[in-house]
Amino acid sequence: MPKLEQFEIKKYWQIFSGLSPSDNKVTHDQVAPILHNSKLEAGVLGKIWFLSDIDGDGNLDFEEFVICMRLIFDMVNQNITAVPDELPDWLVPGSKVELVRQRASQGGVAAASAAPASAGEAPEMEWYMSPEDRALYERLYQKCQTATDGSVGYQGVKPVVTEHFQKITQPELEQVWALVNPKGFAAIDRDPVMYLFHLLRQRSDVGAKIPAGVPASLGETFAKERVTTDIANEGQGAIRKSELHIASASRSNSARPKNENSDYSATAGTDWEVVQLQRELAALDSQLSDLKQQQESAPPTRAEVLREQFEGLLKFKQAQLSTSTNSSPAMNVLSLTEDIDSLEEQVTVLQHYLSTRSETLQQLQWEIQSLK
């Protein structure tokens, strides 16, 4: 397994920041698209998650995220043929050495993934759900933290599973979650949640074997597309290609000595919130620049053109009046006065219209400025 390079850690930081971590941690739901895109088996992903989540809080901080990404890419690029039972020393961050030792003393992955005790061979999973079972799972579903559309995320179902199926380990929950959520959605609908409880209950009560696939009759139910308004995760599907290049580039590097821990100093002092705000500011500046260009290139308004024409006509009539030598001055003066009055009324109307448009323009400029 090639050693972990600094350029690799920096790239993982960019991916981590793009997931919008909270308190410098990302949830399973946030990482789920990357896990799904790896195309690794659910059991493998469950083991990788367990190894990465060193403190066992169900989330990954940046150091744990690096471990998760590196194990995934090593499996995808076939740098390793199986996920190790324990993390190699060079992949363990110095701040978590003691936690890793404590977990190893408690049995590590072997203890976490041990199946419930049962006599003889583990029974097959039963997919049929009786009305009594459905009523029970409906009550459990009501305890989950649901979205407005009734969907449930991984973190929304996990507390209920922990409370009612205490024999279920996290890798087993990960495996069953992937089974009823084959497309790796951030949240699943009510029916997949019911089957999640159904499978976990059998696993917990009688040690039933978790199946590798689902019946064809349920495949469409579990893979059904959901309409989502969450734009935070857009573009995550494109992450995989760029990250795979990182792990591939490290194949030829020599392995780090076993007693050396990973150095995560490359991201010291980095503030992911600053990165996010800088991106938003750059986007707003671009929008403001486009609006200014449109304003400068816009043709004169109809009101401005008409005003210039009427002002020119007014000056012409005034010049005619001052130089008139007609024998009927009173009649000409009266006619010109009426023309001037009419023009002045029209100019007044146009000035009022121009003033209104100017106020509208000022309001738009104020809104543009507030975006910055």
From Swiss-Prot:
Name of the gene this protein is made from: END3
Family the entry assigns: Belongs to the END3 family.
Record-annotated EH domain positions: 8-98, 133-225
Coiled coil: 271-355
Region described as Disordered: 242-267
Keywords: Actin-binding, Calcium, Cell membrane, Coiled coil, Cytoplasm, Cytoskeleton, Endocytosis, Endosome, Membrane, Metal-binding, Repeat
Location(s) in or outside the cell: Cell membrane; Endosome membrane; Cytoplasm, Cytoskeleton, Actin patch
Superkingdom of origin: Eukaryota
Record's bilayer topology term: Peripheral membrane protein
Binding, Ca(2+): D53, D55, D57, N59, E64
GO biological processes: actin filament organization; ascospore wall assembly; endocytosis; endosomal transport; reticulophagy
Amino acid composition bias (Polar residues), ranges on this chain: 249-267
Record's protein name: Actin cytoskeleton-regulatory complex protein END3
Subunit structure, as described in the record: Component of the PAN1 actin cytoskeleton-regulatory complex.
Subcellular location, principal: membrane
Keyword set includes Zinc: no
Matches recorded under SUPFAM superfamilies: EF-hand
Gene Ontology CC annotation, any one: endosome membrane
